[in-house]
């Protein structure tokens, strides 16, 4: 495994951003890892200082994207889902723009490129919206491309790659789809012949193996690799047919780590390229490494994530799948935990609202601070985001912004 622990993912996605941006779900590299330094390594009692609170986001579990002087998220308001734009400085709502009909708990996160925002609604309406909240174009994944959503509708965050938008309608006609990001016109569609064809709730990532750059996605048919011109390169159906496949895969050089929930577990795959083809070998299958929807983070030689949705995070060795530790009764959070990483620390957002700062040590689960936001609205499933010295925590209609910069 000579390249397993190399720089995990080098995305050449075309974003107009600064080093202080977080323009899409799980950040610039879609791995949940921030490159920031100079952050608090522990928190005082009560947590870090609260910079501001925003309200009026609507219902749902979507997290935020941060770009320039704006923050974007999605929320259900009445019978429709909306993109919500906020001022980055104080959280003031600047505008809202309808995406399409609401359908249950909204979990998609907008993707931002310069002055345009791309968002997918629960019922399959994919929209491009300009910086003033005006719709540039819209496509319907179900009606136009034969899309087949899962039981909780769509929950994907669009991928921007160069001049294209990549999404996963599901179904047999266009299981994966590429559109021109400027016009919304179809570039290619890729039918994927697996036993289960419903869209999952994961988001597409980019992998390059042996010079072959391609898209990797976890949907209800399992894992798939699709070329940049829309051809199926490989499939791995062992993880298919689940109640819901949610966590976004982690690209680790020529390896793919993918965890799913409902007691199923995780697989590490080794990809080999030869003569323009990619072959896949399963390195291991680890039933203990389940994860429903909180995501998994790679830090060095280890991966960290919640065990299914139990509120019992684990640390496991990447190369073997061996569990090094699993949280017991220590710590403060409870229920499903989503996670991000910044400046040598894990940030867990638990279902009971608790936000915990954790030292990612293979020696055990060790919190170095925790707090609970003042108010909550139902389950706390939105992934935390750390960007430009700020920690963003979504609680339904509310967004909290905390200052996590270390004092000089």
PLM region spans:
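Bacterial N-terminal signal peptides
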Residues: 6-16
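Noncatalytic, solvent-exposed loop/strand surfaces
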Residues: 17-408
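N-terminal secretory signal peptides that target proteins for export/translocation
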Residues: 1-2
